[in-house]
Amino acid sequence: MSDMPTLTVASYNMRKAIGVDRRRRPDRVLHVLQEIDADVVALQEADKRIGGRGAAVPHELIDDHGLYKPVPFRVRHKRTLERLPGGARAEQLLKLNTRNLGWHGNALLVKKHVGILDVAALDLPMLEPRGAVMAELLIEDRPVRVVGMHLDLSGLWRRRQMRTILEAIQRRQHKMPTILMGDTNEWRDAGACLQELNGAFRIAPTGPSFHSRRPIAALDRIIVDHRLAIEAAGVHASPEARKASDHLPIWARVEL
């Protein structure tokens, strides 16, 4: 048994908290995350796409739940109301939720013991709005970088987006072990965007995560560089998870 400290990470395309029963249940998303009990979680589709574009799981609900804190990226999207006369006043009158959780739907949640050293919100080349989020974290006095991403449906754009993410990592001032995770929209392990990894990273053997009712495709992936050893990995397929989204969450435990 190794004495090295471990880190459990998870990735979850939560589909704006809308389950396969077509009900929006942010509390159900948090319950699924509690079942997994990861130290760091990358969420995709964590913000709404229309109107105020607020968090699909409200900040207040996350705070009340108490297990996680959102990583603050201090960015926000251009919102529909900002294009209208008196938009800010309308937000107040309608009590709209306009506080986003992440960047283009990508968010990171960490447990309270995880330190946050630095953060970045990345713009990705795209046909439709896409982004990624990056956080440099401190876990048991060991630094680790985590990137959350949701790549394009187009293979050509996925490859460009992965290249942009890897270039952003290379430009970082401090070198540290790195984990990429999210919905890659890539059906094949030999897909073009994953070829950009050039052997510098390994894909954790999590398994198929889509569709949650009958998983046949490993669209969601956790990718770690060779400084990290993968101790275990899998798909979380509890009854609650099968209902909460059309994707199942994936997880991996790595040695730091």
In which residue ranges do the predicted regions lie?
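Active-site regions of metal-assisted phosphoester/phosphodiester hydrolases
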Residues: M1-V40, K48-R49, R53-G54, D64-H65, ...
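Residues lining the SAM
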Residues: Q44
